[in-house]
Swiss-Prot record:
Belongs to the type III pantothenate kinase family. This is Type III pantothenate kinase. The gene is coaX. InterPro entries: ATPase_NBD, Type_III_PanK. ATP binds at residues 6-13, 132. Coiled coil: none annotated. GO terms for biological process: coenzyme A biosynthetic process. The keyword Disulfide bond does not apply.
Length: 254
């Protein structure tokens, strides 16, 4: 079995693949203060609840946008699984040309998503990943990663509104019933939610215009299922796109 680990700023998503089949997946909070032993104990509990054992894992691949945790998780892999993990970054064969001023600047998660998206669809794509930041990535018909845009995530935007406007409360992220809201909480939710839908559609349309193409638009990430139904541009939600990309990269580098 293959263990794939996607380390984001807010969450770590883990998956277990048996061949091409994703058999289990988990989402835990990202905590830079945890040690490799603490993550190991947590992972042992998750494995036990799923009737899995560490000995069943024969390979591990990690994508991380949190550098302090990369080494911690590498230690976890060596100490608990006795395996050196593959880490997405320089030296990993992606099979994709990166059309970027400095390819090393492209986040590992963005490359992983691009690889998975093109492998599955074999057509031009825009991939919208709703994470701590929301990323927009364009892959052309040749399968080349062409760049994209980065915007503040939905949660960051909502938290900034609470922090910087002293009379406004902290509210949950949800789809409000109306854009013309009748109370402060719904007004904030309407502004953030519908404003963010407009941001997504606006950036996607601009990328389409600049690309002179009609790419398929994939959405992934924790809040994709919330935003996609209101979006005019998102064609499909792929919840496990990043995990699938890690599996594909493992196959290309094993």
């Amino acid at each position: 079995m293959l263990l794939v680990i996607d380390v984001g700023n807010s969450n770590i998503v883990l998956g277990i693949y048996d061949g091409e089949l994703l058999v289990r997946h988990w989402r835990i909070s990202t905590d830079k203060s945890r040690t490799s032993d603490e993550y190991g104990v947590m992972l042992n509990s998750l494995f036990s609840l799923a009737s899995l054992s560490f000995s069943q894992v024969k390979a591990i691949i990690i994508s991380s946008v949190v550098p302090p945790l990369t080494g911690v998780l590498e230690s976890l892999c060596r100490d608990f699984f006795a395996l050196p993990p593959y880490v997405v970054g320089p030296g990993i064969k992606t099979g994709m040309q990166i059309q970027y001023d400095n390819p090393r600047e492209v986040g590992a998660d963005r490359v992983v998503n691009a690889v998975a998206g093109f492998e599955k669809h074999r057509s031009p794509l825009i991939i919208v990943d709703f994470g701590t930041a929301t990323t927009f990535d364009y892959v052309n018909s040749k399968g080349e990663y062409c760049g994209g845009a980065i915007a503040p995530g939905l949660a960051i935007s909502l938290e900034a509104l609470f922090q910087r406007a002293s009379k406004l409360p902290r509210v949950d992220i949800c789809r409000p019933p109306h854009a013309i809201a009748k109370n402060t909480v719904n007004s904030m939710q309407a502004g953030i939610f519908y404003g963010y839908v407009g941001l997504v559609d606006g950036i996607v349309e601009r990328i389409k215009l600049e690309s002179r193409d009609q790419p398929r638009v994939l959405a992934t990430g924790g809040l994709a299922a919330l935003i996609a139904p209101e979006s005019k541009t998102i064609d499909e939600v792929d919840e496990f796109l990043t995990l699938e990309g890690l599996r594909i990269l493992y196959e290309r580098n094993r």
